[in-house]
Amino acid sequence: MKLWDILATCLLLLSSVSTRPLFHKLQPSKRAVVRSESPALDPIIDSQPETSNPKQASMEEQYDLTGLYPEQFEDVMDFIEATLGRLRRSSDVEPQMKRDRVRQKAAANTEKSGGRGRGERKRSRGRARSRDDRVKGQGRGCLLKEIHLNVTDLDLGYRTKEELIFRYCSGPCHDAETNYDKILNNLTHNKKLDKDTPSRTCCRPIAFDDDISFLDDSLEYHTLKKHSAKKCACV
């Protein structure tokens, strides 16, 4: 579109030059000759040249105009050639700029896709490690488990249809036993200690869930505290 706009402008300039009146550039000597010679003619003969003088003047003006056109045409043609040269250079530069922009976009997309790929690989490795940790945790003994129950199933004397998730600690603590626990177990087994000796290390909660409140069948509110385990350990 830029090329056609500039060409249209050049054509308008060319047409304006071709139709522009150039009477102010006419040579005054020819008009002076016509005026100086006309009074010397005979009155009888003078009537006819008066009718032919406008034609003769117009032919002279036309002759002068055609003499002036080549210089103006040369200026306009020089302007058009210079404009076309600039357009050719700009048309050669624009495809190169477009190719550079395409390369830059492709490189940016490659970097983004590479970054996403690295992030996905890191996340997959993290998920794999978490699965391994869960598998290893299952073999360590003391674990946090959960079960879905009704509040009435807790046998705390409440009659309600409310439900909750009960979490509890379960599993052996052989790996967590110290020499103290081993000695205590051996002495108890050999009956060298009384039966009221504290029991061995067991899996118990070391943190509890938040308190819960519920409405029983008698429309009374109750609150349970330290009812469910949140974190377990061998103690």
UniProtKB/Swiss-Prot annotation:
<dbReference type="GO" id="GO:0007422">
    <property type="term" value="P:peripheral nervous system development"/>
</dbReference>
<feature type="compositionally biased region" description="Basic residues">
    <location>
        <begin position="119"/>
        <end position="128"/>
    </location>
</feature>
<dbReference type="GO" id="GO:0030971">
    <property type="term" value="F:receptor tyrosine kinase binding"/>
</dbReference>
<dbReference type="InterPro" id="IPR001839">
    <property type="entry name" value="TGF-b_C"/>
</dbReference>
<dbReference type="GO" id="GO:0060688">
    <property type="term" value="P:regulation of morphogenesis of a branching structure"/>
</dbReference>
<feature type="disulfide bond">
    <location>
        <begin position="173"/>
        <end position="234"/>
    </location>
</feature>
<feature type="glycosylation site" description="N-linked (GlcNAc...) asparagine">
    <location>
        <position position="186"/>
    </location>
</feature>
<dbReference type="GO" id="GO:0005615">
    <property type="term" value="C:extracellular space"/>
</dbReference>
<dbReference type="GO" id="GO:0021784">
    <property type="term" value="P:postganglionic parasympathetic fiber development"/>
</dbReference>
<feature type="signal peptide">
    <location>
        <begin position="1"/>
        <end position="19"/>
    </location>
</feature>
<protein>
    <recommendedName>
        <fullName>Glial cell line-derived neurotrophic factor</fullName>
    </recommendedName>
</protein>
<dbReference type="GO" id="GO:0005576">
    <property type="term" value="C:extracellular region"/>
</dbReference>
<keyword id="KW-0325">Glycoprotein</keyword>
<dbReference type="GO" id="GO:0065003">
    <property type="term" value="P:protein-containing complex assembly"/>
</dbReference>
<dbReference type="GO" id="GO:0048255">
    <property type="term" value="P:mRNA stabilization"/>
</dbReference>
<feature type="region of interest" description="Disordered">
    <location>
        <begin position="34"/>
        <end position="60"/>
    </location>
</feature>
<dbReference type="GO" id="GO:0042803">
    <property type="term" value="F:protein homodimerization activity"/>
</dbReference>
<dbReference type="GO" id="GO:0051584">
    <property type="term" value="P:regulation of dopamine uptake involved in synaptic transmission"/>
</dbReference>
<keyword id="KW-0165">Cleavage on pair of basic residues</keyword>
<dbReference type="GO" id="GO:0008083">
    <property type="term" value="F:growth factor activity"/>
</dbReference>
<feature type="glycosylation site" description="N-linked (GlcNAc...) asparagine">
    <location>
        <position position="150"/>
    </location>
</feature>
<dbReference type="GO" id="GO:0031175">
    <property type="term" value="P:neuron projection development"/>
</dbReference>
<keyword id="KW-1015">Disulfide bond</keyword>
<dbReference type="GO" id="GO:0030116">
    <property type="term" value="F:glial cell-derived neurotrophic factor receptor binding"/>
</dbReference>
<dbReference type="GO" id="GO:0090190">
    <property type="term" value="P:positive regulation of branching involved in ureteric bud morphogenesis"/>
</dbReference>
<dbReference type="Pfam" id="PF00019">
    <property type="entry name" value="TGF_beta"/>
</dbReference>
<dbReference type="InterPro" id="IPR016649">
    <property type="entry name" value="GDNF"/>
</dbReference>
<feature type="region of interest" description="Disordered">
    <location>
        <begin position="91"/>
        <end position="137"/>
    </location>
</feature>
<dbReference type="InterPro" id="IPR047020">
    <property type="entry name" value="GDNF_TGF-b-like"/>
</dbReference>
<comment type="subunit">
    <text>Homodimer; disulfide-linked. Interacts with GFRA1 coreceptor and RET: forms a 2:2:2 ternary complex composed of GDNF ligand, GFRA1 and RET receptor.</text>
</comment>
<dbReference type="InterPro" id="IPR029034">
    <property type="entry name" value="Cystine-knot_cytokine"/>
</dbReference>
<feature type="disulfide bond">
    <location>
        <begin position="169"/>
        <end position="232"/>
    </location>
</feature>
<keyword id="KW-0964">Secreted</keyword>
<dbReference type="GO" id="GO:0001755">
    <property type="term" value="P:neural crest cell migration"/>
</dbReference>
<feature type="disulfide bond">
    <location>
        <begin position="142"/>
        <end position="203"/>
    </location>
</feature>
<comment type="similarity">
    <text>Belongs to the TGF-beta family. GDNF subfamily.</text>
</comment>
<keyword id="KW-0339">Growth factor</keyword>
<dbReference type="GO" id="GO:0035860">
    <property type="term" value="P:glial cell-derived neurotrophic factor receptor signaling pathway"/>
</dbReference>
<comment type="function">
    <text>Neurotrophic factor that enhances survival and morphological differentiation of dopaminergic neurons and increases their high-affinity dopamine uptake. Acts by binding to its coreceptor, GFRA1, leading to autophosphorylation and activation of the RET receptor.</text>
</comment>
<dbReference type="GO" id="GO:0048484">
    <property type="term" value="P:enteric nervous system development"/>
</dbReference>
<dbReference type="GO" id="GO:0030432">
    <property type="term" value="P:peristalsis"/>
</dbReference>
<dbReference type="GO" id="GO:0004709">
    <property type="term" value="F:MAP kinase kinase kinase activity"/>
</dbReference>
